[in-house]
Amino acid sequence: MPSVVTHKFRQNNADQFKEAFGEAAPTRMYMFIGGVKAWTNDASPPTPNDAVANTVYAHWRDMLSCKKVEASDVSYVIPRVNWTSGTLYTEYSDTNSTLFSNTFYAMVSDYHVYKCLFNNNGGLSTSTPSGTSSSIITTADGYKWKYMYTVSAADVLKYNTASYIPVKTLSANDGSNQWSVQQAAVNGSIDIVDVTAGGSTYNNYHTGTLAAVGNTTTVTLASGASAVNDLYNGSMFYTTGGTGLGQQKEVINYVGSTRVATLASAVSTGLDGTTTYSVAPKVVLQGDGTGATAIATMNTTSNTVYSMTVTAVGQDYSQANVVISANGSSGVTATAYIAPKTGHGKDAVAELGGFNVMVNCKFDKDEGGKFTTSNDFRKIGLLRDPLLASGTAANGATYDQTTTFGLNAVSGTFVTDERVDGGTTTSNAYIVQANSSQIKVTSQDGLFAAGETVTGNTSLATANVLTHTIG
């Protein structure tokens, strides 16, 4: 039976991992380093695998030190996409099953991140999006973008890489533009209506400045309007400028000889000779939400519908159909893109595909003597809820996972990374640090006996084991 791992499932996995660091009774995670032994070819290390021999045994033997990972060391991240001129960005669509595999957002040079809502019918992006407005940002190339958030300077330093950028959703007002965007988001809004077919023979449109206003339901169109009776019946009259901007009314009667259009209902704000208008096909957004409206923009050369402008985004839609009608015209189709359930910009992590989590745990010099600074390491990993030798849960800031041998009767000089062999037990280990009185070892195989002689495999130095201390 076909199945799919949904983006919501992937997001849940990331949420659970990240939340583990900040819960009331948090999972204790430690970042460890290990592996002083050289690989067969250090320039081409082996691919890690999940064998029991590695995850249960070898990594522990090779471990040098570990440091507790705090909640402040963890961030959601998304693939880094730098805005680049000449790129076709994928526009957001609630029906696009491969959205998160596409380039549908971009970060600009000042670390603002924008989501592409409309790509100008498949055009190339040539104008850099800018600004932090909560409203849709339209650029000169016809693209429409949604400002999502800005990567802070601190997060740039800690989590920004060539491949990933950090992303977060705010839970409290931090005074940022992102918080304003989150608060302005509208559940189930329709921000974009995309024309999929422009139709044909749309001659019943007109733009101009009103010649006269009769009353609240009658207007006289400009001199270039049609002389054909009823031509604009069923179309939408929309005020585009001047007095009474932004009103939409259906034309129910048109007299060609006088150019008088009768509107289905009264305008709420009086119109006058400064009012500019557009008469175009009527657009109705039918769905389970309320309040969304849109108007059509015409291609006056081909007499087709070129695009739609959403004049009110509405709310609470989960599905919607676009119905377009005008007297004597046909063939136009369009799709309404419904925002995520909480609205564009409400949850940047979920909306941009924050399925990955980055851990950045800084090792500060020798961490009070718990970490070596005189050797290298070849392994790095995470420990979940490690236990101390006593059986209690580890909760300290750092731990030293090496064993220190106190020596006497030293002859010669031990060197780091060499194998040291026991003369009695045939045990062996690898030296992390060495001086004239002690050696610190890891990757121990077998138990050394007190008093036995150990020999460096490379230096041939010898000494007797006087004491041994774990950690």
PLM regions and their residue ranges:
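Feature for peripheral, non-core segments
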Residues: 1-113, 117-471
